[in-house]
């Protein structure tokens, strides 16, 4: 039986847990973080499952690994690890990982106050303010967003027919507005919203699995 010891730093983004993995990072194949993301999922997904899932992790945890950039103009690269997979982009994870990396001096910005970071979805720009040894705030300029599809529908076991649009902003997101079978967040309990959201997500993925592919980043899809 093989034995692996991972050194990590845990933090949080407004209460949402973040875990930066420092050691035992795999040697990934690929010329971009998008390609390396797929290589990780193919060969090393056990790392994600071991560190993100309970008992070591949490359903809301965002994890990540820092890698050297592929383009020397950028500062570094991030691979995101979540319970749901390896997201092409994660704002929660970015804010937490950047904060850890700066406060622990794990990265050296090329320009103080600005970081250009490679993620599987592309290159994001992060601005931050650091006072003494602490990061006081982090802002992100994300990859280009766009409306992918509109006026789609699925049949929910709990709510009936649900109409939605799909937008892209580093990941594909289903946007559900008020409608006949869905009134508002305030009309449901938190556990209902979590359960219904998962069911709706799974039905969208099953029905439209081949529909949502990034127009020029074919490795990014639903």
Show which residues each predicted segment covers.
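A glycine-rich beta-to-alpha transition motif near the start of alpha/beta enzyme domains, typified by
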Residues: 1-158, 162-165, 174-220
């Amino acid at each position: 039986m093989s034995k692996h010891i991972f050194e990590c730093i845990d933090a949080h983004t407004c209460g949402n847990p973040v875990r930066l993995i420092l050691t035992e990072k795999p040697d990934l194949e690929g010329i971009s973080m998008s390609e390396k993301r797929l290589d990780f999922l193919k060969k090393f997904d056990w790392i994600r499952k071991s560190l993100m899932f309970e008992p070591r992790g949490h359903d809301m945890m965002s994890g990540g690994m820092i890698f050297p950039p592929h383009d020397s103009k950028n500062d570094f690269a991030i691979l995101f690890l979540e319970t749901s997979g390896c997201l092409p982009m994660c704002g929660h994870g970015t804010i937490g990982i950047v904060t850890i990396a700066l406060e622990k001096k794990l990265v050296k910005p090329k320009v103080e106050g600005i970081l250009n970071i490679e993620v599987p979805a592309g290159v994001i720009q992060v601005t931050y303010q650091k006072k003494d040894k602490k990061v006081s705030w982090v802002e992100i300029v994300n990859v280009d967003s766009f409306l992918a599809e509109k006026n789609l529908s699925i049949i929910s076991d709990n709510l009936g027919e649900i109409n939605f649009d799909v937008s892209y902003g580093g990941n594909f997101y289903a946007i559900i507005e008020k409608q006949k079978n869905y009134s508002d967040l305030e009309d449901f309990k938190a556990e209902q919203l979590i359960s219904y959201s998962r069911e709706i997500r799974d039905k969208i993925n099953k029905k439209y699995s081949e529909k949502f592919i990034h127009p020029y980043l074919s490795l990014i899809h639903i």
